[in-house]
Amino acid sequence: FIGVIGVAVGEISNQNNEKLLSGSKIFYGDTIVVKPKSNAQILFLDETVMTVGESTELTIDDFIYDPKTNDGNFVTNIKSGIVKTISGKISEKNPENLEIKIPNGSLGVRGTEFLVSLNNKKESTVLLLGPGPENTLGMVPGNIKLTDGINTTVITSPGFQAMIQNVVSLAS
């Protein structure tokens, strides 16, 4: 397994329509489906934390992690809904090894906390929550590179966001 459901409120299931509860294991290739009026928190082995809002579907396309070296690769495909992520050890060591796919683009995440909100697969909003380049906690500053296949936007300041609409579908 690559992670566990830390918190499950309401109806959460996997691609086989098996109910997921707190403590349920998450595996490579799993699709997590969170129904309306439900939410979940997923804790991954590299200490990445995803808080998954209602009416959300995401798939773990790739997760390879070596806890001895913190090397790995993590690719998630968010198909609908809203997901808040705090990146873990994979992104901390190799920021280019964490990728978030969305219906109309993809994100390259560089060690940070961020929110992705999808509106009916037609509009994606990405918000950088932090830490920024001038944080007082001594944390490595993060940034997000958002691309729609044609244009690329880099968000480096917490509280800033970018949006893409109906451009190119990179995620299937």
Predicted features along the sequence, with ranges:
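Short, charged beta-turn/beta-strand-edge "cap" motif at the junction between a beta-strand
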Residues: S38-A40
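Flexible, surface-exposed loop/linker segments and immediately adjacent secondary-structure boundaries
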Residues: F1-T31, K35, F44-V168
